[in-house]
């Protein structure tokens, strides 16, 4: 795996072997950014289930100012930290080593781009978006990108957000919510 485009484009990303994380493939990651960008002029990213950190690092590579990455698995945390170091711009990234629910209670400010790829997709995505809405963590132009199995049906609306785009890539479905 590698960063697809932007200032870190072509740099390799480390991933975990096994079933601890399900890294988004380069092809799907590229497609996600073609849906939502493909490039940005600043903004904050929240990656609530970071895995390897590839989505947030790609977002910063393409112009986002900074990213907060949340990961609970210790082995995955080490991979995320290595991938952040690879950028040589570690000050743009903050790794929170905790459960997503705890992170949602602690993060401050608003986010412009949020990635949700939880292990138990539908229920967790709905709960996470509702919690973020309660805490007012969405910028006025927020995009929430949800990656699930293609069989998962997410609600048309959750809290203050509605589906903007939805596409299937192989076994994955990408759903983008906006205000």
Can you annotate each of these PLM segments?
Residues 1-179:
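Class I S-adenosyl-L-methionine-dependent methyltransferase catalytic core
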């Amino acid at each position: 795996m590698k960063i697809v485009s932007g200032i870190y484009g072509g740099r390799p990303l480390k991933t975990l072997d096994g079933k601890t994380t399900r890294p988004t493939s380069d092809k799907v990651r590229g497609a996600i950014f073609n849906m939502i960008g493909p490039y940005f002029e600043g903004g904050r990213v929240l990656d609530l289930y970071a895995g390897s950190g590839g989505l947030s690092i790609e977002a910063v590579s393409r112009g986002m100012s900074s990213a907060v990455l949340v990961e609970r698995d210790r082995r995955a945390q080490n991979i995320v930290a290595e991938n952040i170091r690879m950028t040589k711009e570690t000050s743009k990234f903050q790794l929170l080593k905790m459960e997503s629910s705890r992170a949602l209670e602690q993060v401050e400010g608003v986010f412009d781009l949020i990635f949700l790829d939880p292990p138990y997709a539908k229920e967790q995505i709905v709960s996470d978006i509702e919690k973020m809405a309660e805490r007012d963590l969405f910028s006025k132009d927020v995009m929430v990108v949800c990656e699930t199995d293609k069989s998962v049906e997410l609600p048309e609306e959750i809290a203050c957000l509605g589906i903007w785009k939805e596409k299937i890539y192989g076994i994955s479905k990408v759903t983008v919510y906006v205000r």
